[in-house]
Amino acid sequence: MTPQVLTILGSTGSIGESTLDVVSRHPEKFRVFALAGHKQVEKLAVQCRTFSPEYAVVANAEHAARLDALLKRDGAATQVLHGAQALVDVASADEVSGVMCAIVGAAGLPSALAAAQKGKTIYLANKETLVVSGALFMETARANGAAVLPIDSEHNAIFQVLPRDYTGRLNEHGIRSIILTASGGPFLTDDLGTFDSITPAQAVKHPNWSMGRKISVDSATMMNKGLELIEAHWLFNCPPDKLEVVIHPQSVIHSMVRYRDGSVLAQLGNPDMRTPIAYCLGLPERIDSGVGDLDFDALSALTFQKPDFDRFPCLKLAYEAMNAGGAAPCVLNAANEAAVAAFLDGQIKFTDIAKTVAHCLAQDFSDDLGNIENLLAQDAVTRRQAQEFIAALG
């Protein structure tokens, strides 16, 4: 069997580390061509020593020099690259068959689009790619024969319970709606009066999942679920009015599909990202992920509730942006990234995140986003507007 040749973008993040864990269990199936780790030089050096990629990519020349010195000390042959163009190069290299797109935020868009243009199998963990450029990205993938496989646990669950011959038309398959589950985050039952005093340290402690800091805050505001709604809209060609969100605090049911005959098909499992990663990497077979069996005896109850927009205004803003279409999702994402970064840096309150996003969505913006240059220009404009609003908050 010829091994699949992988580029893993975001290898030092939680998704990247989980991917490498799965890859390490199947050395006969996978070969790592390139790893990209932004600024975590020491962790990336360990990964390079373990997986011997041809290339490693970091953010800038300073980090590249540090990584190169570490690798040369150990006699590693990995070539070190840096910068945004290097990400594009390793994502689109002829040797590569599959690209794990796990860079956080809109920064992951150019490399994901480059992989689509070269017809790669794209393991999509970067939801912002579809939020910011859904129409452009999916059309590019279709035009070049690129397969887009969802890594997000919710979208992967949907992917698993949709018909194998799903055409992107719900009615043809008797589907009434697609249901995304959400944990509700760490503040689901907290008094709303305490939200102004929520600290970054509290917000990054997700009750069920092991995730990075930014996505953990997004989970706490439920903006993460809002971004996933927009992602599902593009991945599954699903009209906004056929997408539902239900809060399920135990994170055992990862998502569901509601059918016309009254059936609801769900995918269950322990909350561990290695399951969706292994599912996509192993297609069409099921491969070992290292995840333990779901223990039904240990499950006391599975509960569900509707999301409360007063508690989660970011989810409401995401619904509005999805329904508005055009540039609104791009603006939503850019404003949120700026606001979350400011919150994590101690500049604004937890409740100011939604205020910042709402302010940016109220500004005038163009819907002419037919190319990556216009998308990135709008992204930059919105970030500037968000930063100005944040500065005015004092």
Segments the model singles out, each with a brief description of its role:
Residues 1-394:
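Catalytic, metal-anchored helix/loop core of enzyme active sites in primary metabolism
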